[in-house]
Amino acid sequence: MFLLPRFVLVSCIIGSLGFDNPPTNVVSHLNGDWFLFGDSRSDCNHVVTTNPRNYSYMDLNPALCGSGKISSKAGNSIFRSFHFTDFYNYTGEGQQIIFYEGVNFTPYHAFKCTTSGSNDIWMQNKGLFYTQVYKNMAVYRSLTFVNVPYVYNGSAQSTALCKSGSLVLNNPAYIAREANFGDYYYKVEADFYLSGCDEYIVPLCIFNGKFLSNTKYYDDSQYYFNKDTGVIYGLNSTETITTGFDFNCHYLVLPSGNYLAISNELLLTVPTKAICLNKRKDFTPVQVVDSRWNNARQSDNMTAVACQPPYCYFRNSTTNYVGVYDINHGDAGFTSILSGLLYDSPCFSQQGVFRYDNVSSVWPLYPYGRCPTAADINTPDVPICVYDPLPIIFLGILLGVAVIIIVVLLLYFMVDNGTRLHDA
């Protein structure tokens, strides 16, 4: 074992002078069991319908268009489809999930429920929503949308209370006040049902502030009650502000079952759509590519806030988004990030994707897959090598055995040669 320190030293020298395996700023996959969710920057169908076809519109390599591993829609996002009438049924399945969408609901759209509302609250909602999506897609293979049927026994219909520009909220639905109620101080209920999926992401939302109607202020109060298990989920307004508040949403992960939506004050809300989560899998971190505009439009960082290790790896370009088709489509930096989908890679980490699994100049943080076992850690004065000890000990033993064999062979031939000279 006296050879081990020398072996480590030699390995350090060889590693520092020769082979390098740095993490690369791409999204990739271990094998063919992967899926990408996106928008126009990866929507092959959108390019096909343009005349003439111009694949520079996308950041995705066109070679992946026929892979069957992409669910993307120009002008949309999973969050936008979840809450609003502008809907696309994102559907996909894979062990390794990649997201490159979210830009189609940003401060640039300036959405708020009412004229005195707050877009900041909707950015907060976006972050909370994607946190649940990313966490759950690290343990589920399949994502799609399902409609949530509900039964309300009153005569009032759902109302488009929350809308701004072209966006109209329809999840959750608002049930209008019954004609025989003089104000909003009343209790009302509706049944809804979740079936067919392993789990569901559903919204539970309230106006967190004093809601003014006909000179009266109301505190919002909403609950969901699982009639099968007895579990209740609820939110009550706690803020005393009268302006600058908006629709605060929590995103619940619920099992199948029969539920009761309950409002104790203001309007009843009931979920109409849910993210359907199916097919449990071994924990596999998702990968998220930053989805933002050119700097001429205001973007947000909510997907970055939502994407945290160990369940998520975040990839971003260091420069402004500048497309070649137009300023918001076909950026070289993001095209480079997506180029990793063209090949398999053995190791993923917070710093990036490793192309090889032997050694690297960077120790992988939050590693997943077959990752490098060694790294050069450079201090200001002395380079130090840190290794996973088991393979190094094993290699040291093999090297020691090899040296012993060589020494034995040398001694054998030296003795044999001496005997021959003596005989001569």
UniProtKB/Swiss-Prot annotation:
GO terms for biological process: fusion of virus membrane with host plasma membrane. It is a single-pass type I membrane protein. GO terms for cellular component: host cell plasma membrane; membrane; viral envelope; virion membrane. GO terms for molecular function: host cell surface receptor binding; sialate 4-O-acetylesterase activity; sialate 9-O-acetylesterase activity; sialate O-acetylesterase activity. It holds the Pfam family Hema_esterase. Keywords: Disulfide bond, Glycoprotein, Hemagglutinin, Host cell membrane, Host membrane, Hydrolase, Membrane, Signal, Transmembrane, Transmembrane helix, Viral envelope protein, Virion. Residues 267-379 are annotated as: Esterase domain 2. The keyword Transferase does not apply. Residues 414-424 are intravirion. This is Hemagglutinin-esterase. The gene is HE.
